[in-house]
Amino acid sequence: MANTGDGIILGLDPGSRATGYGLVRERSGVLELVDAGVVRTTSQPDFPSRLGVIFTAVAELIQRHGPAEVSVENVFVSKNAATALKLGQARGAALAACAVAGLSVHSYEPTVIKQSLVGTGRAEKSQVAFMVARVLACRETFAVDATDALAAAVCHLNQRRLTRLCGAR
C-alpha cells in the first residue's frame, strides 16, 4: 500500500484513449503541483488492453506518490451509448486501482469543479486551465486531460477547506 502521510490528492480524468492525472498537495495553505500528465492507451491493440494500461498506470502513480485521497469528475453522459460505456469502463479501471490501494474516492460534477476554480459552472476549458495555472503557480502548459485532472484535485482540496471552515465533518 502507498504511503498516505503527505496529504497529496490524485485527480483523475479517465478516458479510453487518454487518462489525465494530476497530483496536488496543500502545505501551509498553499496548493502545490506534485506531478501531472496523461496516460495514452492508443498503442494498445484492443479495448481490454487499454483498460489494463489505465489500471496499471494509476496503480503505479499511487505507489510512487502515495496520495491520501482521489478526486474524479463524474462521467459525462454522452448521447452515444457505446462512447458512454467505454468511458465508464475506463473510469472503472482507474477507480479499481484506487480501491485496491484502499483510497477513498470523491466524485464531483463538472459544474462543481468549474465553479470551484473559476467561479462559474459554465466556464470554458481555457478558463479552467488558466485558473489551474494561477492556483498552482506553475508556468508549465499541460494537455487538456491533465488540466482537467488537476482541476479535480484542486476542487477536492477547496471542498476540504470549506468543510474545515464551516466546522462540518
UniProtKB/Swiss-Prot annotation:
Q: Gene3D superfamilies, from UniProt?
A: Ribonuclease H-like superfamily/Ribonuclease H
State the reactions this protein catalyses. Answer: Endonucleolytic cleavage at a junction such as a reciprocal single-stranded crossover between two homologous DNA duplexes (Holliday junction)
Cofactor(s) demanded: Mg(2+)
Which GO biological process entries does UniProt record here? DNA recombination; DNA repair
Cystine residue pairs: none
Q: Where in the cell is it found?
A: Cytoplasm
Tell me the residue numbers annotated for binding Mg(2+) 2: E73
Domain of life of the native organism: Bacteria
State the GO CC annotations: cytoplasm; Holliday junction resolvase complex
Entry's EC annotation: 3.1.21.10
The cofactor remark states:
Binds 2 Mg(2+) ion per subunit.
UniProt-annotated catalytic positions? D13, E73, D145
InterPro entries assigned to the protein according to its UniProt record, in alphabetical order: RNaseH-like_sf, RNaseH_sf, X-over_junc_endoDNase_Mg_BS, X-over_junc_endoDNase_RuvC
The UniProt record lists the keyword Methyltransferase: no
Give the Gene Ontology MF terms in alphabetical order. Answer: crossover junction DNA endonuclease activity; DNA binding; magnesium ion binding
Keywords from the named record: Cytoplasm, DNA damage, DNA recombination, DNA repair, DNA-binding, Endonuclease, Hydrolase, Magnesium, Metal-binding, Nuclease
User: What residues does Mg(2+) 1 bind to?
Assistant: D13, D145
Annotated signal sequence range: none
Physiological role: The RuvA-RuvB-RuvC complex processes Holliday junction (HJ) DNA during genetic recombination and DNA repair. Endonuclease that resolves HJ intermediates. Cleaves cruciform DNA by making single-stranded nicks across the HJ at symmetrical positions within the homologous arms, yielding a 5'-phosphate and a 3'-hydroxyl group; requires a central core of homology in the junction. The consensus cleavage sequence is 5'-(A/T)TT(C/G)-3'. Cleavage occurs on the 3'-side of the TT dinucleotide at the point of strand exchange.
PANTHER family attached here?
CROSSOVER JUNCTION ENDODEOXYRIBONUCLEASE RUVC
Q: What does the subunit comment say?
A: Homodimer which binds Holliday junction (HJ) DNA. The HJ becomes 2-fold symmetrical on binding to RuvC with unstacked arms; it has a different conformation from HJ DNA in complex with RuvA. In the full resolvosome a probable DNA-RuvA(4)-RuvB(12)-RuvC(2) complex forms which resolves the HJ.
Query: What NCBIfam families does its record include?
Result: ruvC
Question: Family, per the entry?
Answer: Belongs to the RuvC family.
**Official protein name in the record:** Crossover junction endodeoxyribonuclease RuvC
